[in-house]
Amino acid sequence: MRIDVVTIFPAYLDPLRQSLPGKAIQSGLVDLRVHDLRRWTHDAHRSVDDAPYGGGPGMVMKAPVWGEALDEIASAETLLVVPTPAGVLFDQATAARWSAERHLVFACGRYEGIDQRVVEDAARRMRVEEVSIGDYVLPGGESAAVVMIEAVLRLLDGVLGNPASRHDDSHSPALDRRLEGPSYTRPPSWRGLDVPEVLLSGDHARIAAWRREVSLQRTRERRPELLADPVGPQDDPGR
């Protein structure tokens, strides 16, 4: 997979060189290329923004600069991702779908965003998705791009040391899109808090049933909208 990120702050993407994403890059599973948008400017000030038509606060990123950048980087096979609080909500299903792509390009806007004509022009020759990572506003698209790229990379074969660890992730199909339950490790007792007895029993069927129940309980309490049928067992699964 190849991933290109266009931004005016290339160093913002440096965390992707760490941990599992970094290993994926070093091993050649992912070809990550980060580009400074100012490379496609032609004025002495290397300006990438201008005042918005119609008035209003803030500045808008200029179409000609973005157009040249995408002309050079993207192709008809590209999926262009534009992080924006006005986009559709990014989720695990989106990450899974993108993990099958050969080429992703992230266009990271700043200020009041990118001139909408950039999206409209790109959509004439490639697929474009405007995507949000949540109902809040960030200073720019870089941190959202890091979040989405990490979510995609961990789904690629060879990135995780144990691929089975994806099986019971929150929002995974194996959990019917529910939340993953709590995890515990040694010691069995710590500061007066004990690991649930069922996890020490060695009874794998009972443990699996407990995990299903706590997953349902946690989802009901924290994200009830994820449940097709919010009415379910009310038993305490921690015993």
Swiss-Prot record:
Keyword tags: Cytoplasm, Methyltransferase, S-adenosyl-L-methionine, Transferase, tRNA processing
Residue numbers spanned by region Disordered: 163-187, 217-239
Supply the name of the protein.
tRNA (guanine-N(1)-)-methyltransferase
Q: What is its main location?
A: cytoplasm
So what EC number does this one have? Answer: 2.1.1.228
PANTHER family from the UniProt entry: TRNA (GUANINE-N(1)-)-METHYLTRANSFERASE
Q: Which reaction does it catalyse?
A: guanosine(37) in tRNA + S-adenosyl-L-methionine = N(1)-methylguanosine(37) in tRNA + S-adenosyl-L-homocysteine + H(+)
Q: What taxonomic ancestry is recorded? A: Bacteria, Bacillati, Actinomycetota, Actinomycetes, Mycobacteriales
Keyword Transferase assigned to the entry: answer is yes
Question: Which gene codes for it?
Answer: trmD
Instruction: State the Pfam families in the record.
Output: tRNA_m1G_MT
